Amino acid sequence: LNAHRNVFPVDPVERGFTWALKSAGDLLEVRETLNEKGLSLADVARLLEHSEMEPERWRDLASIERHCVIATEERGFSDWQATRRRAAAFGKPPAGITRVVMAGVLDPSSLAVEALQHWSRLLPVEVLVYAPEATHRDAFDLWGRPVAETWLTRPIDIPTPETTIHQGGTPAEQAEAAVELLAPYDDPGAVAAIGVADVEITAPLEKALAAREIGAFDPAGRRMGTHGVFHLLRIVSQLAATRSFRAVAEFIRCPDVAETIRRRVEAQTGEKPSLRQLLDDLDTLAVTSLPDTLDDALELAPRVFSDPKKTSAVPAGLAWIDSVLKSLAAPDFGTALTEFLGEVFAARRFRSDNPQDAVFAAIADQVSEVLDALDGPAAHLFPGGLDPAHRLELLLLALGDQIFYPERQARDIDLQGWLELLWEDAPHLIITGMNDGKAPEAIIGHTFLPDSARRALGLRNNDTRFARDACLMTTLIESRRHNGGRVDFIFGRTGSAEEPLRPSRLLFQCADADLPARTLHFFNKPPRRADPMPWQLAWRLRPQPLLDDNSVFHKLRVTQFRDYLQCPFRFYLRHGLRMSEIDATRTEMDAMEFGSLLHGVLETFAQDPDAVVLTDPEKIRAAFHAILDRRLHGIYGARLTVPVTIQRESARQRLGWWAEKEAEQRLQGWHIIAAETRISPEDDPWTLAGMTINGTVDRVERHAQLGVRLIDFKTRSAFDVQKKMRKTVENYHLTPLKRGEEPESHPAWSLVTSSDGTTARWADLQLPLYRLAMERRFPGEKITTAHVTLSKTKPEIGLDEWSGLDGPLLDSARACAEGVIASIRDRAFWPPAEKLPYGDDFGALFFGEPLEAVDPGLLVPGASPE
């Protein structure tokens, strides 16, 4: 690159195969454009040597071209651009050709003209132009090309422009306008055709036609890049290049791939897993172990799916994917890829009379041709050879622009490109996308060949393109003027990315006297295709009543009380229906998983008899860190991802800060006597109002004089942003009534008097329930409760006791818990809280209006499930 700094002034971020392929493609495109005029990069460097058009850069480009041509010829190949130039200058017509007729070609390349001029010395060459000779003799050159100077100023006579020029605000509205013009016809395909000057209109146009049961056919065919096989190969390419788990998940979600995995598992075990179970297990692996690569997934899947009673297809699927990638890395790449595609599509049944199957066959032929080329001699000339990722990248590059041709149905309407409209003979022509830059096509800001350089070199430029398109538009109009035909033009106001668009200059190419009226017509607002309707829900959700054997009627966890107090309906969704949102794309632990990680470290520490007696903060810190690393690698594998590594450092920091406090508690006489203590052992469950209450106390400590302390560890912030002070444990459990909020609006059992004498309501019962449950474990002993905050800043790290949790306050907590239990048994799950204090996992279901989005009819007591 240092030798060609005028072309590559800055080194690429990553100078790899992808960068080289794109750069080579850009330079080949420039050579192709120049070759239309019969020019090489060396020719351009010579022509622009004394110009102000970056001659230094053209010299560097010529140097690159020279090195490439030499390397090509040294390997026994010929430069195909030079071959084309020689053929144009010296070639002879094929045997048997005695006459050449060029009919209606408005824009032949200069190289083609040079070839025909050379042939004209050997045989007759005729040029046919569709135009009246009397008035347009001087509007074309000898080769039928429109003369730019003439067409730049020649008016285009659009019949009744006030009724034949239409506008649509967006591509979809342009499509609707086009389809409305077809409404009078019983068989639109027999009398009308649609022109598409802007490819952005194609998809909405096909959709609008399909909605009216009108088939669409594009004679230019479809790019291979739009087909499902290309999508599959693109994912395989990503897998080969990165082995990322994101690509693995996308790959398995391809229907044919998922079917292949299920089929293979059936062959191995005799039982075919369901598609739902396969995808559920894939999500489970993603959220449980956060694998970053296929190798991570291969290591972690056996741990996640270790239960012999619950088999999973995921480990077998991952092993198959790994074997596919290894086979692609073998010497016979083409055979391996063909066998892979054969296995993936083996379950499909192809029929010769099915148009979609015929397309598949054509695509298979194209894939085979490209694979043959990749196994050819040129592929072996790459330095260091081509690995599977490089071969797949080349395959995609070669296939992406290949064309396949679906079968045209009898009543389909044609969707012609702008330049193909010259050959369309439908009486009624509807042309969409009539915007500047599309018709006429414009060259704006080309990296190597801006419009000024094209003019200087005699290449196609904006003026010649305008002349070509003005002539084409005139031809479309005049060929229908006298035979009852019609041409409608539709332009847009905005593109698919909401960028503003201008009407085509061709639509302004009228007499000066008509220009004001034409301009005013363009400024009219586009007619509404449909009256806008206010947004409303399409339907209301109808939640079903819970069955009597649902677990929430028989046992509750202490944390579930908080969920019910927060919102009864969301409690019903989360715990009654067991609904939860899963983000299988996340790459780091969520708040709950991070908290569980720290809880696990502290539990393991508390169960080590040697660790619990430590009083040296450094030794405690070292013990915490060692346990943390063991747990992390046990869950997420030997290689931690970057996001998890960052979270690991956060965990180490928090535990390191707590180690100092932990040492202080030992020195103060608090000794750990239990960790992760269940308040309801299976052989002796704790019940309240006849309901079994489950829960786990994070830690139990004892002091010789102060009694027993129940600790719950929290990883959230202990700082109250509004009050600008540290939250007390009471603040987490009680919520003061808001200004204007009447106590009567809440059940009496939920109300309580806080420590400052104000009326509040219970928001959480976790520590009070722990206290009540553990009284039977430590009868007659003094019991206190506390929060330990393991937050992300050192000042927030600490232990906060709830010294006032006793007497009337504890009695109120018991009454509240009994009230919640009674309400759940009465199926009081309605109405919902309209707004939660933080984070709503079900907000997307309600569109911000839970009372409107849900029909609670079946939730009322006495309703029975359907």
Predicted regions, residues:
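RecB-family 4Fe-4S metal-dependent nuclease core
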Residues: 349, 532-866
